[in-house]
């Protein structure tokens, strides 16, 4: 059987079990089916081949079905999470098919069904999720105008682990920026139209696994109704979503898919947030990468702004930090409220100290995700004990906040939200054992005293030992057999063992159970009755405990909203405490905000770089309506890019609500932050470095407003000198004359330093350096005025460029400077070079003859040992070297 399709072509040819498997597989095409068989999950046919390749499993063939061998691969059920994690990371989806029938009573194959589908965007199990980042499932629905052109894209995304659902509608060219901000793990799209359709639209690639679902899933009317049903409301006006038709269509597909993967209702999805582009400071994908907010340019998690700020005591706080960094609000009142809370935490009295608060927060579990699993009825016993212990710890935490509630409104709100649901705490305390087993199947989960029947069954199982001791004592006295023993094993159950020399004393009511070489084992009616009762008691206790646990999960469902309220407050408090800790430890200050446009930073520092070096040089940055653009010149490695990035990061941190690394800082309104810093070829997209650079520049020129902050670093590279200079000049003029944005413009084109003479709103600043011999010392200080040179040759020398190349470069630099001082030289093509350059060059690659003569002299000198030379020998050697110097090949 070569393929899955072939296997399913004639299902009647297969064995009953394989018929069952093929029916289930047919309901989940494109998904790996984990088919439970005893203690293993088995995969068959194509699934087995694929899983064996991806998971490094052994592929076997066992038996035949339909006349063909059955390819198999399997994983043990107790280790399934680690295999699921690998598959999900590779973008695969897995259908978990469990045995739901009783093998003892089943006629034919045991009944099985898919209980859940694990996909990259629908993870809830702690073993499959990243602790410090959210996992989102996103659906995209395109809206067309009358000509069939896509004009709007509706987005709906869900964090299934927490129940957070959000909607937005964006223009088609803004979808990539939205996906970069959300970073979904899985994207749902409608089945693609014909590729020949001129109006066809597709989601940008590279943002998560893509799953195609039928087009009718995105029906707007059905999606709107499904959304209303999910939120238990009559309409969406209260959420501000009534006019977002495309987003509602996306939400309908999203909810349908998520519920199908879980096999049940999404009880914890009871709220909706509509996101508008105007709410947040715009950060395009390039800006998020260049500022290294949550990921370095090398793709690592550290060192980044997020890794520096993340001293959170809970994983809930860490996830909220990432969300805040990618969603800085434009409205400064949000930042001011957060900074007010940070100030209150820093000024807290001893009984409510920041250290004590952090100590209490460290005892808190991730109840946000526990609540999600509780709503999906997949919470495990230790989830419930963690939830209980967290609720029990809340009164102490709330008591520490009481002295601070008057100093910050947000802390008063958090204090009120941390009130635990009393009935839920009582139920968990009564029902769950202090230290429950990891899985309900292991028993020991339900607390003693919660259920009388369970306690009785446990007593029977646990009192076996005493019964056996008593029985053994009585039987020894009754039979006179002093070495008689009453024991138990899993194969034969309970038995009475008598050695062969004592078997003549065995009473008539003993029935032989097993014969050994030196002993006989017996069973009595009394022992048999006890055996039946004891063995069935353990089995019945586990069954009773499972039923009680399932009922307990149902009883906890009404408290989902309360649990979510507490989790949200804990995450916010934890993050504010982390901000306060960073401000105290790193000497940060609270920024100011004003309605007047501009940025005024005194002694600002790059937060991440400062943490990596022993000493950091702080610098000022002033941008205002009279000083819109700073032309930044100076040497490579002098700190231009660091200065630009630190300005953007300090502004971003201020609007996020953190204190900032500066002596003083003030900010006017900021609507977007753009960066054009560094570039690389986009090989997959067929774009050169220069094309990438110009594309980013075009986006800035088209979208930047007077309230935007723009960072441009060395624009114009990658083409001829004059072309690059002309473009850089024109771009700078356009930013000043048309965009009017606040701009930091780093360049090595010194001709641009004349721009302030034409535009008074531009100013020159430079990064200073000092030459020392042929070397250079970077001062990293920003000073007013233009730089006098770039120190490119000195930097090249520091990088290890051979001295011969440096010498040749110096000579050619002198030639170029001489040319520029006189008549302008024509712009040369790629293969032209000035004749003077070739005539005057002393580079070994240009003048090999010179190198050969020099080499002869050097080799002769190297062969000489001065310590062995007599006076006469030294004189002869001097004549020899003199003759070599007079040779035609010697340098003149």
UniProtKB/Swiss-Prot annotation:
This protein is involved in the repair of mismatches in DNA. It is possible that it carries out the mismatch recognition step. This protein has a weak ATPase activity. Keywords: ATP-binding, DNA damage, DNA repair, DNA-binding, Nucleotide-binding. One of its GO terms (molecular function) is damaged DNA binding. Belongs to the DNA mismatch repair MutS family. NCBIfam families: mutS1 (TIGR01070), PRK05399.1 (NF003810). ATP binds at residues 634-641. This is DNA mismatch repair protein MutS. GO terms for biological process: mismatch repair. The gene is mutS. GO terms for cellular component: cytosol. CDD domains: ABC_MutS1. It holds the Pfam family MutS_V. InterPro entries: DNA_mismatch_repair_MutS, DNA_mismatch_repair_MutS-lik_N, DNA_mismatch_repair_MutS/MSH, DNA_mismatch_repair_MutS_C, DNA_mismatch_repair_MutS_clamp, DNA_mismatch_repair_MutS_core, DNA_mismatch_repair_MutS_N, DNA_mismatch_repair_MutS_sf.
